[in-house]
Amino acid sequence: MKKLGKYMNTISAKDFNASMAPYVDEGIKRANLIGNRGPVKFDSNGKLAKDILDAYHHNGFYVFEGFVSAAEIELLQTEMQDLLDRAPVDNGAKVDKYGRAAFGQEFARPVYTLIKPLSDPWGGTMALNGRHPTQMTQPLGDSTLPEKVVFAMEGMCQIMSSGLRLYGHPSLLAIASTINGEDFVPYMDAIFVKQPGVGGAVSWHQDGVTHWNSPNWDEDIHGFNFQVQLYDTSAKSCLWVLPGSHKLGKLDIKKIVSDNGSEFLADAVPLHAKAGDVTIVNRQMLHGSYVNTSSDQRVSLTIGFHRKSSVIGQRGALNEAGDAFYDEKRIDERSQVIAVAIDSRGQFYPNEPRFTYVPMQGREDTLRFNPDNWEKVVKNYNLKDLAI
């Protein structure tokens, strides 16, 4: 197989797409042998079914098929397309591609991150605590590509009404409770965007940075991320993972990629999915994604959760300032967004059973979805994310 990587950034997008074909075929075969996908199931106590939980713990991932209804996905797609249309032309710009005021300027943190098409903005840099030590191939596009494209978006709960409702989805929260305990807490959320033929790469990495040397370390100490897929994504555009790597501690990623001879890791598998599928990936899993030279539109709504015990008493990491301290007050304030999201969903889907979030039990009346709580609890909620 052709060796590609940070020293091979003169390959064309067309040739890179072709070079992936045998790797994709083999990856799909490996994924099919593992399985780890199917509809979500719960036991009589409302907990994630044991066979699914065991499969998740063994491999570090699962693909829940048909998780979000087609009607809800359509609402999410509609809002997402509007947000992409209203994106600034570059980071820090005030106008969109039509010359209108760009969306999101009222929020404390920028909503959008834009990058050069087909680039790997974090790979080989010290961004995000240096957790992306290698860089993916960045193929050359043609002259018709835009200068910048949307790569990621922050603040799903404040920029999308449907996103806030999704955050209160009872099945998502029931899974979080099963894995992280009834007092589970939020991590953060982000939207990864890989538009057809221009989407950027996310180089191989493990998400967690805080607890690698903890005396209480175990495979779940850094939590997990859901990704709700808004569109069908093939193995050429989706996330790839190295099964079982969440059990191995902090990995020498540079050595793994070097020993492999290319960024196409031999044992990795693709988490290809349909619109409405939801993937769950342990944050200690080695994972990444390649530039999107395919015709797929990939938009992944990423929602993370932790054990409370992993977060309490810790200081900021990743996108949070190092002097941020995760005390009871900060954890409680950030967790209130879950309660407001549950009520927002309940108002919109009145016939759907609501999830009972134990940390907010008894405070439901004060955490209703209304204009006051949108201003007090939801707006700029991501300033209180709990990254570890």
Residue locations for each model-derived region?
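Non-heme Fe(II)/2-oxoglutarate
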Residues: 2-42, 86, 117, 252-254, ...
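Double-stranded beta-helix
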Residues: 220-224, 228-290, 310
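Acidic, His- and aromatic-enriched active-site or binding-groove loops in soluble protein domains
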Residues: 203-223
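Short helix-to-loop capping/linker segments positioned immediately adjacent to catalytic or ligand/cofactor-binding
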Residues: 163-164, 174-175, 212-216, 228-230, ...
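Short, structured patches in soluble enzyme cores that scaffold and shape functional sites
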Residues: 190, 195, 206-208, 228-232, ...
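A structural signal for short, well-ordered beta-strand segments and their strand-loop junctions
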Residues: 63-66, 185-188, 238-241, 280-281
